[in-house]
């Protein structure tokens, strides 16, 4: 009876081995992806574009979290001067309600760097529509509208900035 119990446990263990290995592999893959994401964010913060792009690519391979990896990839591309890639990633972020605000803010910044205030204003307005209390979006709208002399649109944005305690 003891031998039969031992054989039963051994067979059950062998049958469960593939699923255990699969879970372990998936967990390790996710852990490695989160590490790549963290290292990529640190590289962006440190101003290291090559490392940021390398870690962003690694995180995209390992994680099924396009919001996070697209944001990192957009920042890394922007940092390395690849505005076309950054625009693609920021545009991708605009397609999801959870990340649309960040996508539009990123597109506004890219447009400002390309000296395209019209596109920047459109993106900043969209960001402000998504988050009406955002001082960042309101500040961009306020400045761009003021530069156009459109005070009736700049003043409401100024109110948002002032309520947020920004100067």
Language model segments and positions:
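TPR-repeat structural position
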Residues: 49-50, 83, 117, 151
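Alpha-solenoid helical repeat scaffolds
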Residues: 68-72, 88, 101-106, 122, ...
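Alpha-helical segment of the N-proximal tetratricopeptide repeat
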Residues: 29-65, 72, 76
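Transmembrane alpha-helices and immediately adjacent membrane-cytoplasm interface residues
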Residues: 2-24
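Short coil turns that delineate tetratricopeptide repeat
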Residues: 64, 97-98, 132, 166
């Amino acid at each position: 009876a003891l031998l039969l119990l031992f054989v039963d446990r051994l067979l059950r263990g062998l049958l469960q081995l593939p699923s255990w290995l699969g879970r372990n592999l998936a967990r390790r893959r996710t852990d490695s992806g989160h590490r790549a994401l963290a290292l990529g964010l640190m590289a962006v913060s440190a101003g290291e574009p090559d490392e940021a792009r390398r870690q962003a690519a690694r995180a995209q391979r390992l994680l099924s979290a396009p919001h996070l990896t697209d944001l990192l990839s957009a920042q890394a591309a922007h940092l390395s001067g690849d505005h076309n890639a950054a625009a693609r990633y920021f545009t991708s972020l605009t397609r999801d309600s959870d990340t649309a605000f960040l996508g539009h803010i990123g597109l506004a910044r890219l447009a400002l760097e390309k000296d395209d205030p019209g596109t920047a204003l459109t993106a900043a307005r969209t960001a402000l529509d998504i988050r009406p209390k955002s001082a960042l979006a309101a500040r961009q709208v306020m400045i761009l509208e003021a530069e156009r002399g459109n005070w009736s649109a700049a003043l409401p944005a100024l109110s948002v900035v002032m309520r947020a305690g920004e100067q």
